[in-house]
Amino acid sequence: MGNDALSIARDLIRCPSVTPADAGALGVLEPLLKNAGFDVHRITFSEPGVADIDNLYARIGSGRPHIAFAGHTDVVPPGDEAAWTRGAFSGDVVDGFLYGRGAVDMKGGVACGVAAALDYLAAHGGRPGKDGSGSISFLITGDEEDIAVNGTVKLLQWAAARGEKFDHCVLGEPSNVEELGDCIKIGRRGSQSGTLYVDGVQGHVAYPHRASNPIPEIAALITALVSEPLDQGSSQFQPSNLEFTSVDVGNPAANVIPGQARARFNIRFNDHHDQQSLRALVEARVAGASGNRVRTRIVWEPSNADVFLTEPGPFTDLVAAAVEDVTGRRPELSTGGGTSDARFIKDYCPVIEFGLVGRTMHQIDERVPIADLEKLTRVYRGVLDRYFA
């Protein structure tokens, strides 16, 4: 087992850790960190009705400043493994690329973070900081790709109960769009899902006057909701976006007018809203568009994905400088994309996301250039050098 990012990433990929299975992935990291002097804890979290999940927390040092690296070792299913040109869990290296599920999202990023920390410690007498007074920690979960209830959110609670305090965190999600160094995520839009219901009156299609068809009504409401923007965006965020994802009536009969129609939707919202104000806005628009013609209601799904922003400042400047030093490009500070575990971390310390290029994540033949693994390791090492300077 090597200490370089490629060796660590290959060992991780060879563990088929599709959520909720760990499949030995955390066991790859534990001895590497222990041998470097980290105090390592393996914690299993439980929740009724869902699978138990293994997590790992490791820390070296006891003082401040304290920087954490966060990530996950679980992966999405590989899909049709026969469609892969290399085994989905082979960790094969071909023509300068490392293949396998998780190569990009995000076993490669975890491997680079660990390799950078080990390299930094080897060069500084095994202690973080110029005088050994700082701390480096790792927050690694196996529950990010699924419902994320037994992962980072509970690992942070567990750490806080122990008295752990973090000053800053780097989350190694694949933040870059086209090339390594093009983007640092400094925030994320919130996410809220719901289902719009329109009640009609079921009846025979030959006697429409005895029924009330909810389909034209829900179609009109969908048009009304998507035709007017929720907002125009803000200085750090793009406009909020409402997307309908399904429309259903549950009616297999061609001669029956359905009694109810429903449409499911998701909203990615910016810092003009919180969940309460967003729900009120959508409900008001539905009420205004429907009038007294039909009965409507919205059932909102629980959400733990609030909008957040890590304000640009010394920490974002430090990370951007480390990125530019390695890649030669100054990264954009972005809040685009979907949700991540940063939504939990932001309640404990400022957090940014910087990792690999996400072009092939969740795809058949997911792969990462070996050169990018080497560069990302150097970026993370540069972050540590600057952080403890």
Swiss-Prot record:
GO MF term set: acetylornithine deacetylase activity; cobalt ion binding; succinyl-diaminopimelate desuccinylase activity; zinc ion binding
Entry superkingdom: Bacteria
Any Gene Ontology biological process: L-arginine biosynthetic process
UniProt EC number: 3.5.1.18
InterPro entries for the chain: ArgE/DapE_CS, Bact_exopeptidase_dim_dom, DapE_proteobac, Peptidase_M20, Peptidase_M20_dimer, Peptidase_M20A
Pathway: Amino-acid biosynthesis; L-lysine biosynthesis via DAP pathway; LL-2,6-diaminopimelate from (S)-tetrahydrodipicolinate (succinylase route): step 3/3
Named cofactor requirement(s): Zn(2+); Co(2+)
Pfam hit, one: M20_dimer
Claim: Repressor is one of the keywords in the record: no
Residues that bind Zn(2+) 2: 105, 145, 362
Reaction equations catalysed: N-succinyl-(2S,6S)-2,6-diaminopimelate + H2O = (2S,6S)-2,6-diaminopimelate + succinate
Gene3D superfamilies per UniProt: Zn peptidases
Keywords recorded for this protein, A-Z: Amino-acid biosynthesis, Cobalt, Diaminopimelate biosynthesis, Hydrolase, Lysine biosynthesis, Metal-binding, Zinc
Location of the active site: 74, 144 (proton acceptor)
Comment on bound cofactor: Binds 2 Zn(2+) or Co(2+) ions per subunit.
Binding site for Zn(2+) 1: 72, 105, 173
NCBIfam families in the record: dapE_proteo (TIGR01246), PRK13009.1 (NF009557)
Record text on subunit structure and interactions: Homodimer.
Job of this protein: Catalyzes the hydrolysis of N-succinyl-L,L-diaminopimelic acid (SDAP), forming succinate and LL-2,6-diaminopimelate (DAP), an intermediate involved in the bacterial biosynthesis of lysine and meso-diaminopimelic acid, an essential component of bacterial cell walls.
Recorded family membership: Belongs to the peptidase M20A family. DapE subfamily.
Protein's name in the database: Succinyl-diaminopimelate desuccinylase
Source organism: Nitrobacter winogradskyi (strain ATCC 25391 / DSM 10237 / CIP 104748 / NCIMB 11846 / Nb-255)
Gene: dapE
